């Protein structure tokens, strides 16, 4: 979700920023001898400071808002050239440079590749002992500087009336474009790293950011999406993608590797290994490493990505570090990384897009060994290390931007998108998507929902809703009401030092989809009901099974990083309707009563979340998220003219796990679910396979099953999607630049329905349930398919076939379908 938010913020702020109509010079610099492109050549207009460097393919682009006469091109090893320009005209030129014979004798000859491979093998073999992440018994001072800037903003765009007030916070660059500082944080820590723990004490800090998010949310988002680059690891994860290290066991299959140089670093001999990708399809680095000749530790690095790297919105990346030795250990003394993003839904090298630059620098000082880890502890110093005064101007620029109208509008709009509430004085109206409902039972149903806002009380809220469905209600073919009323209320209170505890009391009288009581597990960050205005068109396309319920619930919730616990006690009545009748021993009953207690344990690893007003948004994690649920229930079916009241007990248990992570050069998305219902439960409490209601798909749903087609009291399911890096489209000329990826899809579900549920001794199964003959008990349901994702970086399409139970009589069942989805991904 934060991927969508980040793109949204940039778009909101600068939707109308376009390329200025300046004088533009586009060209390519080549070697006169070999016609190969020359990278990193300096190109500038004579007599000005307007310049740039060529990219990996030798291309450059220069702009000037005044006409220029002469262009100068220079690169080490070649003779400098001056190019006469057509005064005042845009030009596309090709420039050839001759080698400078006078320095050819200084060029270092590169020995065989085998020597580089041997060094890298030894570096990999010793990776655990040399990895700075594994160094213990040291103390150090870390100075961390992180900045985010919006980049490549044209002057003429800032002169427009809508964006004119942004000039107060703009910073002019050497290429005549402007940047806008978004976030700046300098923090100084005292660290002590022991074998069993790391002590981290904040010495001094200063942070400023656009008020689109609270400061702590900025820090969490940046921490979640900052690249984790470590050449000692086989893969480094960048924006959810795995990039292979040049010291990985199979690196020689993907990299060109050369032993380029040797020198002395920290008094020890080191060898320089240069590396570059062998082909354009993999996620690989280029650059060089310095490796210690004795310990095979990496003492210095300079790493970047090739220009052809196919990761959405990733324009460039650079990472470097240097080290110092103390005793037998090597530890960094400086780390730098920068990641450049741009908004380029359509690939074009000649089109310049605004983007963002995230830069981070960490410097370490006063690093010493500690011998007694039990007695030595960091103590807070009375003398704070000062913050860099040179950054004061940037902090002031951010303050200026926070006063602009466009920033204030952007903050308001982002808040509505994330939390879906309109703040009116001390009252919140929303969620916005809940203001209108539509389903086959209610028909069109406008709804008013309000609550007390955070400005009324930061730790308490009370609210309610009322809705009216315009569809007449019938029971046994008799009109019982004109329309259907929905209403309810909620009281919530959060308490404790960190507000991790929440108590709530809720009353609901509303329609709900049958069999989707686990929706809060699969859509944890959602604030709206499952039947809302955004899904209204779905009901027009394909009706789903819903029933009315009246429910009173009391819930306690506790949450801390990595762990969440909920316990919910409730009593409810589930009402029959003309679509889903309730039949007990041959007689229809108007409702049944259900008293229950449900617990949910949520486990996660290295996952952050944004804590809003009684709403939490979970950020992406490469590790699984697991839910363990248990429920005990008592039901009562009222007496009818033919039957006495019926009472029973049942238990329901579940495990849910899902993960979205990089695997090799691709990505894998999987969901595992297993449930068991014991005792005697009414059919709405059984387990129903999640189904896709329309041609729009979700990774956690079966795509071809009909509503309530697979219902059981013992159930297991696995949905799996693997996304490649473009093994087919990545090799097709002209098409590969669009970054289309291939998807492989496999979904399997098995449900066992016990004999006792095939009769009406509890409640008769509805007629549209097609497992009533227990046909699913012997054969699992399987569907598979393939698809294409990252289409225009906005969505994907999938072709899916049903492999088993192809003769289903469910009118909603499909043996083949084309599914689609819209989503922003890196």
Regions found by a protein language model. Name each.
Residues 86-111:
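Extracellular beta-sheet/turn segments enriched in Thr/Pro/Gly and aliphatic residues
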Residues 1-28, 43, 104, 666-674, ...:
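Bacterial Sec-dependent N-terminal signal peptides
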Residues 23-25, 32-47, 66:
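Short, ordered, surface-exposed loop/turn motifs in non-cytosolic proteins
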Residues 25-31, 58, 95:
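A short, amphipathic beta-strand motif
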Residues 101, 110-270, 276-284, 349-437, ...:
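Structured extracytoplasmic
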Residues 48-59:
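Short, acidic Ser/Thr/Gly-rich low-complexity loop/linker segments typical of extracellular
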Residues 237-243, 248, 369-826:
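Exposed, low-structure sequence patches enriched in small/polar residues
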Residues 45-46, 72-83:
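A short, solvent-exposed loop/turn motif at the edges and junctions
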């Amino acid at each position: 979700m934060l991927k969508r938010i980040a793109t949204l913020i940039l778009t909101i702020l600068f939707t109308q920023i376009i390329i200025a109509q300046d004088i533009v010079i586009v060209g390519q610099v080549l070697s006169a001898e070999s016609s190969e492109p020359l990278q990193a050549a300096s190109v500038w207009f004579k007599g000005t400071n307007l310049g740039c460097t060529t990219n990996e393919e030798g291309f450059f682009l220069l702009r000037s808002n005044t006409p220029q006469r002469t262009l100068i091109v220079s690169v080490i090893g070649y003779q400098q050239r001056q190019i006469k320009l057509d005064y005042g005209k845009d030009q596309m030129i090709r420039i050839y440079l001759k080698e400078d014979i006078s320095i050819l004798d200084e060029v270092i000859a590169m020995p065989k590749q085998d020597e580089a491979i041997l060094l890298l093998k030894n570096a990999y073999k010793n990776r655990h002992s040399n990895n700075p992440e594994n160094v213990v018994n040291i103390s150090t001072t870390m100075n961390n500087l992180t900045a985010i800037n919006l980049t490549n903003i044209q002057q003429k765009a800032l002169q427009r009336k809508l964006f004119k007030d942004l000039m107060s916070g703009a910073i002019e660059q050497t290429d005549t474009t402007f940047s806008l500082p978004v976030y700046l944080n300098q923090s100084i820590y005292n660290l002590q790293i022991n074998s069993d723990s790391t002590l981290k004490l904040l010495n001094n800090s200063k942070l400023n950011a656009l008020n689109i998010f609270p400061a702590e949310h900025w820090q969490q988002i940046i921490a979640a999406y900052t690249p984790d680059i470590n050449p000692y690891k086989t893969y480094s994860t960048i924006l959810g993608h795995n990039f292979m290290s040049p010291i990985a066991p199979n690196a020689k299959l993907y990299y060109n590797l050369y032993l380029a140089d040797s020198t002395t670093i920290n008094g020890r001999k080191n060898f320089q290994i240069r590396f570059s990708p062998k082909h354009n399809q993999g996620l690989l680095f280029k650059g060089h490493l310095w490796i210690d000749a004795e310990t095979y530790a990496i003492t210095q690095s300079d790493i970047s990505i090739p220009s052809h790297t196919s990761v959405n919105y990733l324009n460039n990346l650079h990472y470097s570090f240097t080290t110092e030795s103390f005793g037998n250990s090597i530890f960094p003394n400086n780390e730098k990384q920068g990641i450049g993003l741009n908004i380029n839904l359509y690939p074009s090298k000649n089109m310049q897009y605004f983007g963002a630059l995230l830069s981070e620098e960490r410097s370490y000082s006063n690093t010493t060994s500690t011998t007694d880890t039990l007695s030595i502890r960091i103590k807070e110093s009375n003398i704070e290390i000062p913050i860099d005064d040179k950054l004061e101007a940037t902090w002031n620029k951010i303050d200026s931007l926070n006063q602009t109208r466009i920033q204030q509008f952007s903050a308001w709009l982002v808040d509505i998108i994330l939390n879906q509430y309109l703040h009116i004085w001390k009252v919140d109206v929303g969620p916005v998507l809940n203001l209108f409902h539509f389903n086959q039972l209610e028909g069109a149903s406008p709804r008013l929902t309000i609550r007390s806002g955070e400005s009324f009380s930061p730790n308490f809220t009370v609210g309610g809703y009322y809705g009216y469905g315009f569809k007449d209600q019938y029971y046994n073919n008799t009109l019982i009401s004109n329309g259907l009323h929905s209403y309810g209320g909620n009281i919530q209170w959060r308490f404790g030092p960190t507000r991790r505890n929440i108590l709530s009391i809720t009353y609901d009288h509303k329609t709900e989809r049958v069999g989707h009581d686990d929706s809060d597990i699969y859509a944890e960050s959602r604030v709206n009901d499952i039947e809302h205005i955004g899904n209204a068109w779905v009901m027009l396309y394909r009706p789903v099974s819903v029933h009315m319920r009246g429910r009173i619930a009391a819930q306690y919730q506790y949450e801390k990083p990595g762990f969440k616990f909920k316990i919910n006690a409730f009593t409810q009545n589930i009402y029959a309707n003309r679509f889903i009748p309730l039949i007990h021993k041959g007689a229809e009953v108007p409702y049944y009563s259900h008293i229950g207690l449900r617990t949910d344990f949520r486990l996660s690893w290295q996952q952050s979340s944004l804590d809003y007003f009684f709403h939490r948004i979970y950020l992406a994690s490469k590790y699984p998220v697991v839910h363990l649920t248990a429920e005990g229930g008592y039901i009562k079916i009222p007496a009818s003219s033919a039957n006495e009241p019926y009472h029973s007990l049942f238990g329901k248990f579940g495990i849910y796990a899902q993960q979205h992570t990089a695997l090799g050069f691709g990505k894998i998305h999987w969901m595992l679910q297993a449930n068991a219902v014991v005792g005697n439960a009414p059919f709405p409490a059984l387990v129903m396979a999640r189904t896709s209601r329309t041609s729009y798909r979700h990774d956690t749903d079966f795509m071809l099953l009909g509503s309530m087609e697979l219902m059981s009291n013992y159930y297991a399911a696995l949905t799996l999607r693997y996304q490649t890096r473009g093994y087919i489209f990545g090799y097709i000329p002209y098409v590969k630049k669009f970054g289309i990826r291939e998807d492989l899809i496999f979904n399997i579900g098995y449900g066992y329905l016990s004999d006792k549920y095939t009769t009406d001794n509890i409640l008769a199964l509805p007629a549209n349930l097609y497992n009533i003959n227990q046909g699913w008990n012997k054969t699992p349901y399987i569907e598979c398919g393939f698809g294409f994702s990252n289409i225009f970086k906005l969505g994907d399409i999938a072709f899916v076939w049903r492999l088993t139970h192809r003769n289903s009589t469910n009118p909603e069942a499909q043996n083949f379908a084309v599914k689609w989805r819209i989503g922003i991904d890196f």
